[in-house]
Amino acid sequence: MKMNGLSVFYEHILEACGQSGKTEEAVLKEALSYGYDGLDCDLWRLEDRSKKEFFADCGFHVSSVYNGFDFGHDDEKLSKEKIKSSLELAAYYGAKKFLAIAGFVWENDDRQAVISKMCGMLSYMVSEAKKYGITVMLEDFDDAAAPYSTVSGLEYFMKNVDGLRFTFDTGNFAYSLESASEAYERLNGYISYIHVKDRSYDISRRNADDSNGKADLSGRIMYPCESGGGYIGIEGIIKKAVKDGYDGYLAVEHFGAADQLLYMKRSAENLRSFLK
């Protein structure tokens, strides 16, 4: 099988610096040696525009960005201004994928009114993004307050926002007690990017301050692990996605990893093994 490009979250690079005591440049070059050359970046991290040259000097580019919005509650003018400035910054870095975290529905909200407003702002963002050749995406965000945390929720947005695409986070459907494999079958036609996230129930995956566990909707605690080291079934999902024609980046994600560099290395090794 063809080996897709590998991306890693920039936050993991920074976490690895704190864990290892190494400089950012040293960690990036170590990640490069594992096979990564893309970065998934929280947009605010890119406000210092000198990062573009720094990343390039280390052998990296920005493969995707993500940013949080509150489309369901913010004033329309404010949302549009934030959309425009966000897209301009993403375009400066050459990012072609933009994951919009569109906001949440709270207990006392008029749920349908908030979702309708989200759809309107996402439609505007998709239209604006076309000017830069950027694809706007939603993901299966692992929070019950996100109306796009489930397969059915995502299907609603995909069907009601023309041109909106899907970032398939392989590990987030587990939060909602849904099967990632079944989600892939239903949403495959919308996928434009993949976050390769695995989950583990193994408490040995806890970090030093026991802050990296996340409860699924049943209350069971999930821990981050290297891609391919947990129970999600990463190998089968990724093999099928590539066989079905997915040729984009595989973005390794394991926020809160007890040892970010080790997990990056193991994730890259596993993905190369799966796609031999």
What are these regions, as identified by a protein language model?
Residues 57, 65, 127-231:
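Acidic/histidine-rich catalytic cores of soluble enzymes
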Residues 38, 97, 193, 248-249:
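Residues at the N-termini of beta-strands
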Residues 15-20, 38-51, 70-79, 106-109, ...:
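Acidic-and-aromatic substrate-binding clefts and catalytic sites of carbohydrate-active enzymes
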Residues 8-12, 41-45, 64-69, 100-102, ...:
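A cross-domain feature marking catalytic cores of carbohydrate-active enzymes
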Residues 67-83, 102-115, 217-221:
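Surface-exposed, active-site-proximal loop segments in enzymatic domains
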Residues 1-96, 163-165, 201, 268-276:
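N-terminal pre-domain/capping segments
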Residues 24-28, 48-52, 83-87, 119-126, ...:
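Generic structural signal for well-ordered alpha-helices
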Residues 90-111, 135-142, 251-252:
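Active-site groove signature of glycoside hydrolases
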